[in-house]
Amino acid sequence: MDALLQLKGIDKAFPGVKALSGAALNVYPGRVMALVGENGAGKSTMMKVLTGIYTRDAGSLLWLGKETTFNGPKSSQEAGIGIIHQELNLIPQLTIAENIFLGREFVNRFGKIDWKKMYAEADHLLAKLNLRFKSDKLVGELSIGDQQMVEIAKVLSFESKVIIMDEPTDALTDTETDSLFRVIRELKSQGRGIVYISHRMKEIFEICDDVTVFRDGQFIAEREVATLTEDSLIEMMVGRKLEDQYPHLDNAPGEIRLKVDNLCGPGVNDVSFVLRKGEILGISGLMGTGRTELMKVLYGAMPRTSGYVTLEGHEVVTRSPQDGLANGIVYISEDRKRDGLVLGMSVKENMSLTALDYFSRAGGSLKHKDEQQAVGDFIRLFNVKTPSMEQAIGLLSGGNQQKVAIARGLMTRPKVLILDEPTRGVDVGAKKEIYQLINQFKADGLSIILVSSEMPEVLGMSDRIIVMHEGHLSGEFTREQATQEVLMAAAVGKLNRVNQE
């Protein structure tokens, strides 16, 4: 089968770094090509070379059988290559239709915008994606998941022959993911080629036909997905066997440290649970069931309307995140780029931001040596891959950004560490490093709450698991009781089993 798009022998170097060396990628009509590799493997650089953001140092790009060079995203888009970025690229103050057709508005014979036609076309695109809202809605009123679907509708509006999807389901619910997969299958039947960049093995084996593996900027292999297992694919990605993906630590938890009684707040109804010293408590449930809201009410980022929280026997009232930090409760957000990190600031500044009290003199000036020492220690402990602590954090891979976000929380010396989706957007190698760090915190006696949409992660790492359904607690299970089936039954409200201590 002839490829729609073929990149061969692609080299790209930056000062001191060879980002791509002999990289290759083929995209075939009517097939989905997964592009996989650890963070820093060269996937993003390859996409930037393809779309003309970067100029390749060597190699060839064949588009529809002809040697081609794109001089920027506009030229590749007009040629028929659409890309859906992981970072949303929408204007919240405009409607869905205005975002989809921005700069390409329909005009009538009098030169005025044909609003009726534009909204009708946009509604048609949304209907193709099985979405329940109309295109006259403001983008800013949509959830992150729905905004992602608008991005997909926008690319579909270009009638692209090849569509690149970069972690497209990262913020989508299961229903939205099913809708996306239905659309991908429709696009395949129309003869379009899809590049599907993802860390999610389950999705790759469900929706992709072929897979291309990158490692350290090099092309490793192209295979049919049907010929692989998850383990063999991961081994190609990391270049080593991944023994025991979830390294659980069997240390018995200690006495009760945190007690939550009848907690209520936005999206949270009458939730009670306990957390012990040296325990990992998993929080499971479907998206939108109140898991993140519960954590934010506990931490002080959302208002508590009723209920009691005691920490080491003393009542805690958290009206703000500052109250949470002051009481020894740290929350690491699921959206590290919006709530967690300041991307334009350095690794050092991000890591020490919430712990400046520890590095300040009585007059308010900073003890820079102490700050540098502490940041350096955490960089070594967490194996953060960065040229220096002065590097802008936005230039680090997702896994290294997440390590910095967790390190920042630990700098305040907390008693309770809340990790909300700690491995989202993180490659398989960095995931294991984060799991090992979590076990280290547990061994040191830290109390950890692990919120995750990945059931194997919750099952593999937790000592005990509670499940949320529609703002309520619908189940509480020991590690031995918990299975994927039991957690899913509780998550959809078919099972209600809560053990109160």
UniProtKB/Swiss-Prot annotation:
<dbReference type="GO" id="GO:0015611">
    <property type="term" value="F:ABC-type D-ribose transporter activity"/>
</dbReference>
<keyword id="KW-0762">Sugar transport</keyword>
<dbReference type="Pfam" id="PF00005">
    <property type="entry name" value="ABC_tran"/>
</dbReference>
<dbReference type="InterPro" id="IPR017871">
    <property type="entry name" value="ABC_transporter-like_CS"/>
</dbReference>
<keyword id="KW-0472">Membrane</keyword>
<dbReference type="InterPro" id="IPR003439">
    <property type="entry name" value="ABC_transporter-like_ATP-bd"/>
</dbReference>
<protein>
    <recommendedName>
        <fullName>Ribose import ATP-binding protein RbsA</fullName>
        <ecNumber>7.5.2.7</ecNumber>
    </recommendedName>
</protein>
<keyword id="KW-0813">Transport</keyword>
<keyword id="KW-0677">Repeat</keyword>
<feature type="binding site">
    <location>
        <begin position="37"/>
        <end position="44"/>
    </location>
    <ligand>
        <name>ATP</name>
    </ligand>
</feature>
<dbReference type="InterPro" id="IPR027417">
    <property type="entry name" value="P-loop_NTPase"/>
</dbReference>
<comment type="subunit">
    <text>The complex is composed of an ATP-binding protein (RbsA), two transmembrane proteins (RbsC) and a solute-binding protein (RbsB).</text>
</comment>
<comment type="function">
    <text>Part of the ABC transporter complex RbsABC involved in ribose import. Responsible for energy coupling to the transport system.</text>
</comment>
<dbReference type="InterPro" id="IPR003593">
    <property type="entry name" value="AAA+_ATPase"/>
</dbReference>
<dbReference type="GO" id="GO:0005524">
    <property type="term" value="F:ATP binding"/>
</dbReference>
<keyword id="KW-0547">Nucleotide-binding</keyword>
<feature type="domain" description="ABC transporter 2">
    <location>
        <begin position="252"/>
        <end position="495"/>
    </location>
</feature>
<feature type="domain" description="ABC transporter 1">
    <location>
        <begin position="5"/>
        <end position="241"/>
    </location>
</feature>
<comment type="similarity">
    <text>Belongs to the ABC transporter superfamily. Ribose importer (TC 3.A.1.2.1) family.</text>
</comment>
<dbReference type="GO" id="GO:0016887">
    <property type="term" value="F:ATP hydrolysis activity"/>
</dbReference>
<keyword id="KW-0997">Cell inner membrane</keyword>
<keyword id="KW-1278">Translocase</keyword>
<dbReference type="GO" id="GO:0005886">
    <property type="term" value="C:plasma membrane"/>
</dbReference>
<keyword id="KW-0067">ATP-binding</keyword>
<dbReference type="InterPro" id="IPR050107">
    <property type="entry name" value="ABC_carbohydrate_import_ATPase"/>
</dbReference>
<keyword id="KW-1003">Cell membrane</keyword>
